């Protein structure tokens, strides 16, 4: 229940809008759609048996769907729907904070890797400010969050400095294990998108979205879990599970 309450706070709806200029016709092959009985999340395939997402996506009856572009289209040809064995969130994650908002999902069976389903590369070095990143997730263009999102979109935005991020989010504690990506001041138009969008920078998965006041697909500043910081934890979980 606490996870659902946090999720509701992260997904308060205003008017909904989307930008067709950002719509893409095919899914980044690492991108995973996590469907639940509440609201969906994005995830990233990092191993044939493991998906990484935000810890606030620990939601009821989660279903892992790979190779999907439009979730509402049941006729897509390259879907893989896989059950999960367990969800492991970071031990320091708390529902009262956006810090350590990261979780691993172990699949029941290995994903079949092909042209439409591939692994994302994990980073083994950090990145500097002004690095350009590609952020992808699904967007709603109707005022009904209980329907499936209508379009998959990608936007290219850059990493900003910690001082800029702290200025954008004065009431949040921006720690060294967070990454901020977007344009300041942002909040240019209302929107609604699927949470936990990944940030791919220089071909590496550098961030998983924890929170944004607005929408990252509109280049509003998002606060991401910095994946590089969590590499030891990720490797340990996969090795021991």
Swiss-Prot record:
GO molecular function: serine-type endopeptidase activity
Domain of life according to the entry: Eukaryota
EC number: 3.4.21.4
Organism: Homo sapiens
UniProtKB keywords: Disulfide bond, Glycoprotein, Hydrolase, Protease, Secreted, Serine protease, Signal
PROSITE patterns: TRYPSIN_DOM, TRYPSIN_HIS
Glycoprotein recorded as keyword: yes
Protein's recorded name: Serine protease 58
PANTHER family: KALLIKREIN-RELATED (PTHR24271), SERINE PROTEASE 58 (PTHR24271:SF56)
Localisation per UniProt entry: Secreted
Disulfide bonds: 41-57, 133-201, 165-180, 191-215
Upper classification of the organism: Eukaryota, Metazoa, Chordata, Craniata, Vertebrata
